C-alpha cells in the first residue's frame, strides 16, 4: 500500500534532475560563450596631444561600442577558431600581380601587388605594405577581405608572402620565414619605394607580422622614411616573455601551441629537401639539425630551438627570442603607431599587454587600443548568429590610416600657409 502511494512522486524527482541538468548546461553555455560580458568601446591608452585628439575626433570606431555577434561573438575562443578555420565569410577575390625578388642568399621572396580601386580621400598616392600572420600569405581569406576593403578606399596594397608559406612556391635556398626576420619585408618596401617614388606608406602587420613590421621600422631610422604610420594587430611583443605563458593550459594556450606547431611542422617538412637535403649547401648551424626531434615536437618553442633559430645562427633559444622580438625596437619608432589587441585573445597572455600600455604612456605617437572582445584576429561583427564579411578590425585599420593621411595633409597645408605669411612679411 505504501509503495503504491510513493510511485507518483518518482516523476517529480526525475523532473527535478532534468531541470538541474538543463540549468547546468545553460550555465556552461553562458560561461563558455561569455554571454554576461558587456559590450563597450575599446579601452584606449595614449598621451594627450594634438594627434590623439584629432584621432578621437576622426575615428568613430575608437569611441563607439564594438558589438560582436550576440550568441558567440563574446567568446575569444570561438572568434579565434572561426578566424583560424574560415578566415572570413564571403571573402572577395581581389586581383593582383605576383612579384618575385631574389635575395642575396639565393632565396626567392614573393609578394602580391594590388592597385587601388578608387581615389584616396586625400587624393594622394598611398600604399599599404602588409605583413600577414605566422605561415600566412596573400591568399588567406582575412588578407583578401582586408585588401579588397583597402583598395576600395583608395590604397594600393603590397602583401608579403612569408618565405615557404605558399604551397606552390619552392624554396630556392636553405632558409624560410622566422619570427622576426625583416629581410623579405624590407625588400618588398624597397621595391615599392623604387617603383612608386611618389607614394607614401602605411605599414600594417597582423600577429607575427606585427612583430616583423615594428622591428623593421625600429631597426634603422631610414626604414621610417616615407612612412605615414604603422598599425600592429594581435601581436605578443616579446617571444621571450610569451614562452612560459604558451606552455600553460590557461585559456587553452597549450592546445593552440600544439596546433600551430603541427602546422609549422607540415610546412617545414614540405620543404625538407630544400632545407636539409644532402645536395643543399646549408649553413653550418643547420648541419646538426635532428629531424627526429622535429617530428616529435609538440610546441613552437621546440621547433624554434631545433630549427628556426639556426637559420640565422643564434646560439640559443633565449638569444633568438631576445634579438627577434620587436619589444627592444618599439621605442625607436617615431611615426604614428597604433597597437591593437583583444582582451580575450587566448594566444596573448594579459601580462604581455603591459608592453604596449607602458609604451603608450611614454610616447605621444603611440595609441594602444584594447577591445573586450575579438579573440585572435577575429573581430567579427554581426547581429545574432551570422557574421558580416567585413570585420571591426578591417574598418578600424583603414579608418586610422585615413585619419593619419588627413592629419599629414593638414600639417602640410599649415606649413605652406606659414611659409607664405613669412614671405609676405
Curated annotation (Swiss-Prot):
Its main location: membrane. It is a single-pass type II membrane protein. Disruption phenotype: Neointimal hyperplasia. In lungs, decreased level of phosphatidylcholine in the bronchoalveolar lavage is observed. Mice develop spontaneous gradual progression of emphysema. It is found in: Cell membrane; Cytoplasmic vesicle, Secretory vesicle, Acrosome membrane. GO terms for biological process: acrosome reaction; acylglycerol catabolic process; negative regulation of smooth muscle cell migration; response to progesterone; response to wounding; smooth muscle cell migration; sperm capacitation; steroid hormone receptor signaling pathway. Signal peptide: none annotated. Its EC number is 3.1.1.23, 3.1.1.6, 3.1.1.79. Acylglycerol lipase activity is activated upon binding to progesterone. It catalyses: Hydrolyzes glycerol monoesters of long-chain fatty acids; an acetyl ester + H2O = an aliphatic alcohol + acetate + H(+); a triacylglycerol + H2O = a diacylglycerol + a fatty acid + H(+); 2-(5Z,8Z,11Z,14Z-eicosatetraenoyl)-glycerol + H2O = glycerol + (5Z,8Z,11Z,14Z)-eicosatetraenoate + H(+). Residues 128-382 form the AB hydrolase-1 domain. Gene3D superfamilies: alpha/beta hydrolase. Residues 1-9 are cytoplasmic. One of its GO terms (molecular function) is hormone binding. The active site is at residues 207, 345, 376. PROSITE patterns: UPF0017. Belongs to the AB hydrolase superfamily. AB hydrolase 4 family. This is Monoacylglycerol lipase ABHD2.
Amino acid at each position: 500500500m505504501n509503495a503504491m502511494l510513493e510511485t507518483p512522486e518518482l516523476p517529480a524527482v526525475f523532473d527535478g534532475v532534468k531541470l538541474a541538468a538543463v540549468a547546468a548546461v545553460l550555465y556552461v553555455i553562458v560561461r563558455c560563450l561569455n554571454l554576461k560580458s558587456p559590450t563597450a568601446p575599446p579601452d584606449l591608452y595614449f598621451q594627450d596631444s594634438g594627434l590623439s585628439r584629432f584621432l578621437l575626433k576622426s575615428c568613430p570606431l575608437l569611441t563607439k561600442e564594438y558589438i560582436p555577434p550576440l550568441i558567440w561573438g563574446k567568446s575569444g575562443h570561438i572568434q579565434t577558431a572561426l578566424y583560424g578555420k574560415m578566415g572570413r565569410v564571403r571573402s572577395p577575390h581581389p586581383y593582383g600581380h605576383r612579384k618575385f625578388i631574389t635575395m642575396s642568399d639565393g632565396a626567392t621572396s614573393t609578394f602580391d601587388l594590388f592597385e587601388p580601386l578608387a581615389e584616396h580621400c586625400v587624393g594622394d598616392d598611398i600604399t599599404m605594405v602588409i605583413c600577414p600572420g605566422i605561415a600566412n600569405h596573400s591568399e588567406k581569406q582575412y588578407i583578401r577581405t582586408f585588401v579588397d576593403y583597402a583598395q576600395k578606399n583608395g590604397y594600393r596594397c603590397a602583401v608579403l608572402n612569408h618565405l615557404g608559406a605558399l604551397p606552390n612556391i619552392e624554396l630556392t635556398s636553405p632558409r624560410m620565414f622566422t619570427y622576426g626576420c625583416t629581410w623579405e619585408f624590407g625588400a618588398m618596401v624597397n621595391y615599392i619605394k623604387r617603383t612608386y617614388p611618389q607614394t607614401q606608406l602605411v605599414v600594417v602587420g597582423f600577429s607575427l607580422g606585427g612583430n616583423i613590421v615594428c622591428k623593421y621600422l625600429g631597426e634603422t631610422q631610414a626604414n621610417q622614411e616615407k612612412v605615414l604610420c604603422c598599425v600592429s594587430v594581435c601581436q605578443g611583443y616579446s617571444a621571450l616573455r610569451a614562452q612560459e605563458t604558451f606552455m600553460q593550459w590557461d585559456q587553452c594556450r597549450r592546445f593552440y601551441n600544439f596546433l600551430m606547431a603541427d602546422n609549422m611542422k607540415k610546412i617545414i617538412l614540405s620543404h625538407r629537401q630544400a632545407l636539409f637535403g644532402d645536395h643543399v649547401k646549408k649553413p653550418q648551424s643547420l648541419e646538426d639539425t635532428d629531424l627526429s626531434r622535429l617530428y616529435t615536437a609538440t610546441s613552437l618553442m621546440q621547433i624554434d630551438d631545433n630549427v628556426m633559430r639556426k637559420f640565422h645562427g643564434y646560439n640559443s633559444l633565449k638569444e633568438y627570442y631576445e634579438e627577434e622580438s620587436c619589444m627592444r625596437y618599439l621605442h625607436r619608432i617615431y611615426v604614428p603607431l597604433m597597437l591593437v589587441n583583444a582582451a580575450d585573445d587566448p594566444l596573448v597572455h594579459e601580462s604581455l599587454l603591459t608592453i604596449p600600455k607602458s609604451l603608450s604612456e611614454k610616447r605621444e605617437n603611440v595609441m594602444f587600443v584594447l577591445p573586450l572582445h575579438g579573440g585572435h584576429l577575429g573581430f567579427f561583427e554581426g547581429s545574432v548568429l551570422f557574421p558580416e564579411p567585413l570585420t571591426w578590425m578591417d574598418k578600424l585599420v583603414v579608418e586610422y590610416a585615413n585619419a593619419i593621411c588627413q592629419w599629414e595633409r593638414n600639417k602640410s597645408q599649415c606649413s605652406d600657409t606659414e611659409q607664405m605669411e613669412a614671405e609676405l612679411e
